[in-house]
From Swiss-Prot:
The gene is hisI. It is found in: Cytoplasm. It comes from the Bacteria. One of its GO terms (molecular function) is ATP binding. This is Histidine biosynthesis bifunctional protein HisIE. It is an enzyme of class 3 (hydrolase). Pathway: Amino-acid biosynthesis; L-histidine biosynthesis; L-histidine from 5-phospho-alpha-D-ribose 1-diphosphate: step 2/9; Amino-acid biosynthesis; L-histidine biosynthesis; L-histidine from 5-phospho-alpha-D-ribose 1-diphosphate: step 3/9. Residues 115-206 are annotated as: Phosphoribosyl-ATP pyrophosphohydrolase. CDD domains: NTP-PPase_HisIE_like (cd11534).
Amino acid sequence: MLKKINFIDINWNKVDNMLPVVIQHNLSGKVLMHGYMNQEALKRTQNEGIVTFYSRTKQRLWTKGETSKNFLYVTDIRLDCDQDALLIFVRPVGKTCHLNHVSCFQVPSENLFFLHDLDCMLKFKKHYGLENSYTFNLHKNGVNRIAQKVAEEAIETAISAVSKNKVELINESSDLVYHLLVLLHSYDLDLYDVIKNLKMRSNKQV
């Protein structure tokens, strides 16, 4: 259940009843867009679980995706320490920017964002890849073949490490990560299932 922000905790007077809001992808952490909410917009956002802004251009409430259907489903809402801005984590449908970009902020993809994008792309190719797609055909050949490739790449990674060949170590490690992601997808798992497990382990004493 979505944890709601208490309206009395917000310093509405400080922001002239127009609260700045940053929208962030709940998995990748990528900043998607920025907007404003009045009290009515925040109330609807919390009640419906879909981001609704107050559009200063349209002079009305505006639900992101009301035309494109690229809605932003809320997973968490956080109020900043000065009680005058919101950070909303979302599960986006499609691309957020009206110019057909993932984010309204066009910045170079950070390394961790790339891993998220790669994970999503490989997951997509499992179901919708072309016949000449290596990823699609791996899934077509079944989990045993994928597992075999993971084992092969793991051995080759170990050999390159023992031989102290850094270039090959990077290349083989890349192959290993790729095939491991494909293997996870074959069981309807993904990168974030592994991250969740690693976070849980990190909280335990070693």
